[in-house]
UniProtKB/Swiss-Prot annotation:
This is Replication factor A protein 3. Keywords: DNA replication, Nucleus. Belongs to the replication factor A protein 3 family. GO terms for biological process: DNA repair; DNA replication; DNA topological change; double-strand break repair via homologous recombination; establishment of protein localization; heteroduplex formation; mitotic recombination; nucleotide-excision repair. One of its GO terms (cellular component) is DNA replication factor A complex. It comes from Saccharomyces cerevisiae (strain ATCC 204508 / S288c) (Baker's yeast). Present with 4280 molecules/cell in log phase SD medium. One of its GO terms (molecular function) is double-stranded DNA binding. Its main location: nucleus. It comes from the Eukaryota. As part of the replication protein A (RPA/RP-A), a single-stranded DNA-binding heterotrimeric complex, may play an essential role in DNA replication, recombination and repair. Binds and stabilizes single-stranded DNA intermediates, preventing complementary DNA reannealing and recruiting different proteins involved in DNA metabolism. Stimulates the activity of a cognate strand exchange protein (SEP1). It holds the Pfam family Rep_fac-A_3. The N-terminus is blocked.
Amino acid sequence: MASETPRVDPTEISNVNAPVFRIIAQIKSQPTESQLILQSPTISSKNGSEVEMITLNNIRVSMNKTFEIDSWYEFVCRNNDDGELGFLILDAVLCKFKENEDLSLNGVVALQRLCKKYPEIY
């Protein structure tokens, strides 16, 4: 299952061979009910040891749902079939944290890298 829906780095979305993939990202805005703007962590192209946030635009949503702005989700996505930029979100799971807990950006990047190297990791 994990190899069929790989967890990907946001910089590699346009090169994903799988029709369905997963990405961990933070909601920045929801301009319309069917559109999102996300930010997802990756390794900086300028400095290979720092984490930077990549903004992802032109994202369509297949479900009628209002997302929590600034919250983290894991998304199950499908690449556009028509050659346009962006992708379609098929499902989303909110990453809930206990009080005073937050997401580790370095941890997300490490998970993305491990999943690329070992696709059987779910």
